[in-house]
């Protein structure tokens, strides 16, 4: 996996200083209240200097949401097949009205911004979010802080951040978060580069599916037959693209000709978010993008869109240049804003994302806010699917609270309760859990009701009593939810056929399956599936093959990305067991069964 700067960023995930997230009223200093604070520069970054005061930077401010509990219950009701409101998704307008903050909240924050010269006219208001661009000089006064340029020691990339920010006392009760400020970490594609290699195959003929995976292997293993999704604008398949990864049309076309000739002529749209480019002739690595489109579309045949979101490229030397703001985006937030602003008719039905990062490396408020935004997509009928990660029980394996406690590391957003997390398997006859499949238990998000019985059974009956006590949170959201093949997928990239491994393969594979299931439901005048998890853990569970062999590993003593020394935990693993487990979830899809269950 690599960072949003296209290089390994594991160094910044080890020993990241503790993030102290306080309620806005917890700290007071000269009429300012501290919102968020780091206790030092995160490991893997060095402070370089100060940006020019005139440097422009775009900020997104999250207002305190007064209806969080009500909204979360609404999402669960809409997604629960046993509830009367199942499938009654909210429109863009209904969601906006439901979450709209009071005039008092907005006025208080607008008045504070205006006091520093940021007029209401220059602020874009979007439900409970405000977006504005201002100079570093103004931002430093506004947030009572100093911004600095920080360089990543692994790849040389630079970002502008601060270690602490505050808001005026008059606005403090109404401000939940402002970014980009304290978030240094960056998501990575969930690819295991160790298993990337050239392949000498030109079609699915005579392929040993125990050695190499092709679309035909998946169709046979998961009993998909020759079923594809109808090209229906109500069932658009969305694929997330970051890191200047460009999905190349010529590679995709060749892949389809080689492995899915029945879909000859199939293509996908490209949508640019925050100025993302669509470089079809780039020499940069695009393995992740290729893998995603090859298998999500190659399996489903669905009407598809690749959503490219501009990442944080290297800063140019002259920080006065106007495009400096492009290098400080928070890609998840940018993508979520774009999608949630789409009319209902343009929103994807399924969104597949193969990126993640250590949960503890993300500021707590940031992870909470972003997870809630994924919930908003669910409320509007979008199935949000994430790869679980490629670090097994963990790679850094220590806390970032200053104590350096040895522990397993859950992955974000895979551990967000509003997304469907997909772990990895390999082999057929039998299919087994793959060693790098990330899983475990969130330290931020409580275990949701839909998986309570399954996770409680695992902890009480399948996990040896006392095993790994203190290494994980037994009350946290368990992940992954399901699993799929993840080893040596035949993929086309830059004119070559290569074998690629990782849960980056599992997520688009499962997204393709969900797209076909949506198509079946729509053909029977039923709504699309939306947020999947309540259905998966109830009606859908009998449509999965339980994986009971294999397990994950991790905590090997060397970080797999930075190669720095880390705690060694002998035998660290989650085993695949009967029922749900934190390496393969409920198991792998049996399409033949699922296609019937979705009509119940």
Curated annotation (Swiss-Prot):
Its EC number is 3.4.14.10. The active site is at 288 (charge relay system), 292 (charge relay system), 504 (charge relay system). It catalyses: Release of an N-terminal tripeptide from a polypeptide. GO terms for biological process: proteolysis. It is found in: Secreted, Extracellular space. Residues 212-600 form the Peptidase S53 domain. It comes from the Eukaryota. GO terms for cellular component: extracellular region. Pfam families: Peptidase_S8, Pro-kuma_activ. InterPro entries: Peptidase_S8/S53_dom (IPR000209), Peptidase_S8/S53_dom_sf (IPR036852), Peptidase_S8_Ser-AS (IPR023828), S53_propep (IPR015366), Sedolisin_dom (IPR030400), Tripeptidyl-peptidase_I (IPR050819). Gene3D superfamilies: Peptidase S8/S53 domain. Binds 1 Ca(2+) ion per subunit. Secreted tripeptidyl-peptidase which degrades proteins at acidic pHs and is involved in virulence. This is Probable tripeptidyl-peptidase SED4. It comes from Arthroderma benhamiae (strain ATCC MYA-4681 / CBS 112371) (Trichophyton mentagrophytes).
């Amino acid at each position: 996996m690599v960072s949003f700067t296209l290089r390994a960023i594991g160094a910044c995930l080890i020993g990241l200083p503790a993030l102290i997230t306080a309620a806005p009223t917890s700290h007071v200093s000269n009429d300012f209240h501290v919102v968020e604070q780091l206790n030092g520069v995160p490991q893997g970054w060095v402070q370089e200097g100060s940006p020019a005061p005139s440097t422009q930077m775009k900020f997104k401010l999250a207002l305190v949401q007064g209806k969080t509990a009500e909204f979360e219950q609404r999402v669960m009701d809409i997604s629960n097949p046993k509830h009367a409101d199942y499938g009654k998704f909210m429109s863009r307008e209904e969601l906006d009205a439901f979450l709209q903050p009071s005039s008092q909240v907005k006025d208080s924050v607008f008045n504070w911004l205006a006091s520093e010269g940021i007029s209401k006219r220059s602020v874009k208001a979007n439900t409970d979010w405000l977006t504005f661009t201002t100079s570093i000089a103004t931002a430093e006064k506004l947030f009572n802080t100093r911004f600095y340029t920080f360089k990543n020691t692994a790849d040389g990339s630079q970002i502008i951040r601060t270690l602490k920010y505050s808001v005026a006392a008059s606005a403090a009760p109404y401000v939940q978060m402002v970014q980009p400020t304290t978030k240094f970490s960056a998501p990575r594609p969930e690819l295991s580069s160790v298993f990337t290699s050239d392949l000498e195959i030109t079609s699915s003929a005579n392929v040993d599916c125990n050695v190499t995976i092709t679309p035909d292997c998946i169709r046979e293993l998961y009993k998909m037959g020759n079923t594809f999704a109808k090209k229906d604008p109500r069932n658009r398949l969305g694929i997330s693209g970051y890191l200047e990864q460009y999905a190349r049309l010529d590679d995709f076309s060749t892949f389809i000709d080689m492995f899915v000739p029945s879909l000859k002529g199939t293509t996908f749209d490209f949508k640019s978010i925050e100025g993302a480019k669509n470089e079809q002739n780039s020499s940069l690595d695009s393995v992740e993008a290729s893998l995603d489109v090859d298998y999500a579309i190659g399996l489903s045949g669905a009407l598809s869109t690749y959503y490219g979101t501009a990442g944080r490229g290297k800063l140019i030397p002259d920080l006065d240049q106007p495009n400096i703001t492009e290098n400080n985006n928070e890609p998840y937030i940018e993508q979520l804003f774009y999608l949630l602003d789409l009319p209902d008719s343009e929103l994807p039905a399924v969104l597949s994302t193969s990126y993640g990062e250590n949960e503890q490396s993300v500021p707590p408020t940031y992870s909470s806010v972003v997870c809630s935004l994924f919930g908003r997509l669910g409320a509007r009928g979008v199935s949000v699917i994430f790869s679980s990660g490629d670090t097994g029980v963990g790679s850094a394996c220590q806390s970032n609270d200053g104590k350096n406690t040895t522990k397993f590391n859950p992955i974000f957003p895979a551990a967000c309760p509003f997304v469907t997390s997909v772990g990895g398997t390999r082999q057929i006859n039998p299919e087994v859990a793959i060693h790098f499949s990330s899983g475990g238990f969130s330290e931020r998000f409580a275990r949701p009701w839909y998986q309570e019985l399954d996770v409680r059974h695992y902890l009480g009956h399948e996990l040896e009593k006392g095993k790994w006590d203190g290494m994980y949170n037994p009350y946290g959201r368990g992940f992954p939810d399901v699993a799929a093949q993840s080893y040596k997928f035949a993929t086309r990239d830059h004119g070559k056929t290569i074998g690629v491994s990782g849960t980056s393969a599992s997520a688009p594979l499962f997204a393709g399956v969900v797209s076909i299931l949506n198509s079946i439901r729509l053909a029977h005048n039923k709504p699309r599936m939306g947020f999947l998890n309540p259905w998966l853990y109830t009606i859908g569970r009998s449509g999965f093959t339980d994986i009971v062999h294999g397990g994950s590993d991790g905590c090997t003593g060397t970080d797999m990305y930075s190669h720095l020394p880390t705690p060694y935990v002998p035998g660290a693993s989650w085993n695949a067991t009967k029922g749900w487990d934190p390496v393969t979830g409920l198991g792998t899809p049996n399409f033949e069964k699922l296609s019937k269950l979705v009509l119940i």
